[in-house]
Amino acid sequence: MYKRHAQPSQLYNPDLKWETSEQLNIGLDLRAFKDRFSLSMDWYKKKTKDLIVSNIIIPYEAGNSAAPMNAGNVVNEGFELEASWRDNIGDFSYSVSGNIATLKNEVTYLDPHVSGGRIEGSTTMASNGSFSAFEEGFPVWYFRGYQVDHLNENGDPVFRDNDGNGSINANDKAMIGKPMPDFTYGLTLTASYKNFDLSVFGNGSVGNDVFMSYSYNRILYSLKEMYDQRWTPQNLSAKYARPQLTNADKYGLSDAYVFDGSYFRIKQIQLGYTFPKQWTKKIMIDNLRVLSLIHI
């Protein structure tokens, strides 16, 4: 005899509520020198409360997984600044503008019922575990892993024993990076002379890290730097461990795979020419402009 039944997949939480946010902004706008110079500034602080999380510890006798609960607070703080200058000299006109935006965020509270005191995030290889975490006192989803102290005489990594118990385990993991930049910035240059015009735009970021543990699979995603600077008997001062190393699971979750993500690049260059109206009117066109656009 077979019986069919249904049951809730998780417990009910009658106290669950919407997340809330409070934000304070202080701004300043300034124009000077007959509008040739402009400046805009904005400082902000945003507090988000009662974040909904689900990694909650409950007794086994409950029979189900725990319901989501309001268990976290986050603070984001920073400022945004934009300045520009424009002028002309005869038939030549130009403008220069730049902007910068900073961001500092921190998890200010996480309910003690959250399993392990943190929420584990993304994984690279399931067997290696997660490499990011949401934890009180740290930036949102910071990179968490092992720290390589040095390479031994065989080219294997020696990890830092942060808890001092003589063995390397998950308790030795520490903050090894963060994905969010300290600040982002952009720069725009424009110039025109008679019928020609040019604009250049670039942007960048500073202080963000990139975790590239997928390079752990050297067959498919090998980085040239790791290949060139790998340990060999002829290269004892190498930066990276030897291929087929021991403790590969820990090495794949270590700061060996954290790279500086700061960058600046030119994203767009545009060159244009506007035909004189006395030419275009002859073919019944009010305005005609051709341009060459490069996206990088």
Language model segments and positions:
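Membrane-embedded beta-barrel scaffold of Gram-negative outer-membrane proteins
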Residues: 18-62, 94, 101, 105
